[in-house]
Amino acid sequence: MRPARAFIDLQALRHNYQLARESSGGKALAVVKADAYGHGAVRVAQALEAQADGFAVACIEEALELRAAGIRAPVLLLEGFFEADELALIVEHDLWTVVHATWQLEAIEQARLGKPITVWLKLDTGMHRVGLHPHEYQAGYQRLLATGKVARIVLMSHFSRADELNSGCSDEQLAVFETFRKGLAAETSLKNSPAVLGWPQIPSDWSRPGIMLYGATPFDQVHPLADRLQPVMTLESKIISVRELPVGEPVGYGATFVCDRPLRIGVVAMGYADGYPRHAPTGTPVQIDGQPSRLLGRVSMDMLCVDLTEVPQAGLGSRVELWGKQVLASEVAQRAETIPYEIFCNLRRVPRIYSED
């Protein structure tokens, strides 16, 4: 069997959720959209269900997967419903839905629902992605109340630059939110992972931790609370070939790396088809049998090369950590000029192995 594996530490996951909940000062929906950022939504939700206040997913398909697996905790649809017909499924499966557009308000007004639903009413405070316009927000709230079809409303927005700790944008968005929700008697939800970790002064009854659950920092700088996160996924494979190369020999496609001295090269069964970033450059860190080393040359579809020169004991079958407890996913992502969110979500073709250790 091909040796590529992703080991998922469920105890670390629970630790990170508890840190999110304690740091936010309120309730927390564990965000498990995109297959729990590549970690496996069903297994993640099962591991957290006894602890979590609920879950958040992108769409109804993801919610129904959780319900089919027996998850009974609240599940919020972060993008809401895409068609009015989905309201029947929302009622049937006891889901919560975001409402971010006036057509969704109209759909609820016109629908015949078997019981009242929970709505998270989204305000566009400056990200300009989805959400009611500020001047529509109060009216939208009143329209929902007037339907008699809504059991509860939570007021929400989303920060666009909370990962930039020196930016004033989050304070500006908070000011917009407070202005246009004034007088509305409802719980609020503002905090995503960077807001939970970096903006403790922002009030929020509900938080929505995502990337922090999986042990990756949302920041590009050291942060004391983020440093308490524990990596959940360890991506590993093994060396399947060893080469001794003299000075001047190229490594991999395009000869982007040429040996500047005699080098011992290991070929690892891992490539961009598995989700390892193709644009990770020479020098991206790896661990080989617990010893630090580096990536060499261009990442191929199914293989990549590492430097064994300073790890003389390594050879065929040696364990290689691509990211995890020793090699942080955030560092790999930074080297590849992307973010840990993307490299986690890109994981595929790699079996996941779950443990409680």
From Swiss-Prot:
Could you give one GO CC term from the UniProt record? cytosol
Listed PROSITE patterns: ALANINE_RACEMASE
N6-(pyridoxal phosphate)lysine: residues carrying this PTM: K33
Q: Which residues form a coiled coil?
A: none
Q: Which CDD domains match?
A: PLPDE_III_AR_proteobact
Q: Where in the sequence is the active site?
A: K33, Y253
- What is one process in the GO biological process aspect for this record? D-alanine biosynthetic process
Q: Top enzyme class of this protein? A: isomerase
The reaction(s) this protein catalyses: L-alanine = D-alanine
Which EC number(s) does UniProt give? 5.1.1.1
Q: Name one GO molecular function term.
A: pyridoxal phosphate binding
Quote the Pfam families the UniProt record gives.
Ala_racemase_C, Ala_racemase_N
For the ligand (substrate), the binding residues are: R129, M301
Q: Give the residue range of the signal peptide.
A: none
List, separated by semicolons, the cofactors it needs: pyridoxal 5'-phosphate
- Biological or metabolic pathway of the protein: Amino-acid biosynthesis; D-alanine biosynthesis; D-alanine from L-alanine: step 1/1
Record key words, sorted: Isomerase, Pyridoxal phosphate
**Protein origin, superkingdom:** Bacteria
Matching InterPro entries: Ala_racemase, Ala_racemase/Decarboxylase_C, Ala_racemase_C, Ala_racemase_N, Ala_racemase_pyridoxalP-BS, PLP-binding_barrel
Job description of the protein: Catalyzes the interconversion of L-alanine and D-alanine. May also act on other amino acids.
Q: Which family does it belong to?
A: Belongs to the alanine racemase family.
Q: Which HAMAP family match?
A: Ala_racemase
Q: NCBIfam families recorded for this chain? A: alr
Task: Supply the name of the protein.
Answer: Alanine racemase
Biological source species:
Pseudomonas syringae pv. syringae (strain B728a)
